[in-house]
Amino acid sequence: MKAKNILYLIAALLLGKSLSAQVQSTWESINERGYPQWFSDAKLGIFIHWGVYSVPAYASLEGYAEWYYRGLMTNDDRKTFQERIYGKNFQYEDFAPMWKAELWNPDEWAELFQKSGAKYVLLVSKHHDGFCLWPSQYAPKWNSVELGPKRDICGELTEAVRKKGLKMGFYYSLPEWKSDIHRWYVDPDENIGEYVDTHMIPQFKELVTRYKPTVLFTDGEWRNTAEQWHATELISWYYNTVGKDAIVNDRWGEGQQHGFRTPEYSAGITLTDRPWAECRGLGRSFGLNRNEPLENYMTSDELIRHFCVLVAAGGGMTVNVGPAADGKIPLLQQERLLDLGRWLDVNGEAIYGTRPYKKFYEMKPVKVARSEQQIDFDWKRNSPDPAISCDHFQAHWQGVFHCPADTYTFEIQTDDQARLVIDDKEVIDTQKGKTGKMKLAQGQHRIEVFYEEDDLEATIHLLWSSKTMEKQVMTNFQQGAMLPAMGLKATYTSEQPTVCYTQGKNALYAIALDYPEDQLILNIDEPAPSMKVRLLGTVKDLPWKYKDGKLFIDTSGLKYSDLRSTAAWVFQMK
């Protein structure tokens, strides 16, 4: 046996011993146990948000439909919608008996998830509204067995998923909006102790004891500490109860020190000491949002490419479906999953069980230029253009405006960094302050705005005011003194991956996100002369040469009829 294989065997034995050892309720003991390897190897899981909120299935265009009850609490447009459709006396609780799940077939779901290429499933067992999808004794008359479907959804789906050889897990909301003991977002956060002790902990243990889920994804932790949630007590108890394959996520409150990372609608993570999987919907909501436009949904090609980007950085993806109240997963969502599964049927060896290469990507600069009438944007979790990355992009606006003589107050509202320059003078740098004043003469003035988006939400608004003018968004721009076109000249730039790398035990994989018509050029170390290159899904070796620090793979001999993939093409080098 080779020395390298012996080391792998020793490491596996040590990890197995650590995972099976009794875990104490301390962060040190929990972290010493570590994480099961299966999760890092799996790469792909399915999230399911299905509940009472699936009856109204409504939110703003970018909103979370599963937060419907919170919208009623804050009197947002969901309350207006409910009163218009169901009447002023209608209550959220009245949706529960309307949730019939009359077309639900758990075996049908499990087959779809298996065909998607997923290795685990996460069902929302209880969201923040407190409604349980199992017969919880701690939610009398507010569970799926007594109301609505009249079925043990957690139990039936667990059985169906495990029959397909997939691992089953649950999402579980730590707090509740409707609890009689403590109402999340209403009662003081520091008063949550009784709720945790008498309701959350026993219900958590009831769920785990009944179904032994392999994955636990807790949520709603952010207003309290890990100590208040009794995180170490619950995690250690869960690990000791379920065993070596069990894994938890990282949402356990301030001070948590364990769990796989769960970036939400992001570009993922590039450096972490823990396993991670981005969680996201196929659209912009987790629960089904009937108000959501088609353009909010990822295309199949976008889904495949995004998944490759995450895996190349060492992570994975838990992609969400939002079934309708009748139990059917919308056909568009099914199509996306099946397309991803077909791609994995051809290219799975470059995904499952792989590790990051020493460089994740080959990057290319992307630029989009257009006119904008004003700087008044709330892209939320989107980008200004599909070609631009959702995180880490730059924007530059320039033009001219006219104004009467006055002293003006300018304001930039943004969650990131921006600068305002007028007539070559810096008026605002948001790192120093959000507002700035400038005395302007009557006439024309040059304006430039620079914006650096970091991650998550993307928002920028440019406003102005004076003693004679109320604060308002700046408008009526021109692109230059000699250019009559209205608006600002806008330029958006970012870098996007064009090739993703992964590595298996015996091969390096280059996943091309743009099809290389004649050749694929890779900036990697010089390979052994005996290396063979093959496009997955084909049988013939491709010619290659190495020159000036670059690998050139000749793809000119490939025919369209040779290709068995769309969206991304995997070149195996071994």
Identify the residue ranges that each predicted region occupies.
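Generic cytosolic/nucleocytoplasmic N-terminal low-complexity/intrinsically disordered segments
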Residues: 1-4, 16, 163, 319, ...
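Bacterial Sec-dependent N-terminal signal peptides
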Residues: 1-23
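Composition- and surface-driven signal marking solvent-exposed, interaction-prone regions
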Residues: 2-4, 322-323, 329-335, 422-425, ...
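Generic "edge-of-domain/loop-turn" microfeature
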Residues: 20, 53, 177, 326, ...
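Mature catalytic domains of secreted/periplasmic carbohydrate-active enzymes
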Residues: 22-367, 487-574
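Acidic/polar, compositionally biased interaction segments
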Residues: 366-492
